[in-house]
Each structure stands twice: as C-alpha cells, then as structure tokens.
C-alpha cells in the first residue's frame, strides 16, 4: 500500500491560549505538513465551519488535511481524509462511503486492532497511547516503547506493511527512541501547544 503519511502529524486541540485555527497555523509555520482537525463532542455545523477554514490554510501550505471522525463531512468538503477512533465508524464502512481516493486512518492499541484496520483497507494507523495524556478522554492502555516494538514485530511476522504513527503524551525527547522501534511517524498536540514558542517547537 502506498505510504500516504508524513513523519510529523499535528492534531488540533483547543486551549485557553490558542484556537483550533491558530494551533494549526503555528504547526504549519513550523514545517508540519499534516493537520488533523479533532473536535470531539462538537456540533457538526461548527466542525464544518472550522474544517473549511483549516482546509484553506492547509492548501496554502501544501499540507494534508484530515478530519477526525466525520466521514460524511470529509466527503462533502473534499478534505484529504478521515481519522477514525476506536468508537467511531468502522474503517471498512468509511471506505465504502469514501472510495479509494480519500485517506483513512484508524486508531489502534493492539496488534489485533492493526490487523483489523489493515484488512479493512486503512491507509495508516494511529497507534497509542505512548504514555498517559490529558488531551484525550477514555484512554486505552499505555503502550510505551515495548508495546510499539511488539506490534511492529508482529506486523513483520504477519507481512503487514502499513504506516504506524505513534501518538499519546509524546515529548520531543521521546521521538528518537520511538522512531528506533520501527514506527513511521509521530503525532503531536499538547507538546507543541504547551511550548513557549509552538512554531519553534514544531521546527525542532
């Protein structure tokens, strides 16, 4: 399967300091070229308004624009793709709606999750959490480096080739050791937004 991911993915997160738009803009200014709009528990019309703004911003930077959860919205506005969490629509159902031209990512916490998404036609996996994180409710069991090594090894044994993006409580210092496990990329949110200079943090 063609690798449609990039090494750094940024997931928007609303804070007291930054709006969704501002957080995405700073990540893009810092060199990130993959933005995922994540607005859980928000009315779909609000998500659509924000998505259209961010889609234009991503086009200006030549970045990939992914929307979390909202499959029909992705199709409606022609975003680049959708990311589906464990409680969202199944990947196979989303693929049936979107067809082959859209990117579909799925969340995984175990090798069985990865295998299921692979068979369903996912383009990449968001795998985590690496450690405890406050940016997500209903957290799955923490994986750590050993969890990633185990999943990557089982994928090799099963001849499954799929980009795996690590997510969940990752700091800048964690990235070299995570990448050594065979992980394809890193997804960040809070680490960038908590920095004194989010643009500089993204560049680092």
Where are these regions (language model features)?
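Conserved N-terminal beta1-alpha1 strand-loop-helix module at the mouth
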Residues: 1-89, 96-111, 115-123, 150-153, ...
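Histidine/lysine/aspartate-rich catalytic loop segments that bind and position anionic ligands
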Residues: 111-141
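Flexible, gly/pro- and Lys/Arg-enriched active-site loops
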Residues: 84-92, 132-155
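C-terminal binding/interaction regions
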Residues: 181, 185
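Glycine-rich beta-strand-to-loop/alpha-helix junction loops that act as flexible
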Residues: 127, 165-170, 186-190
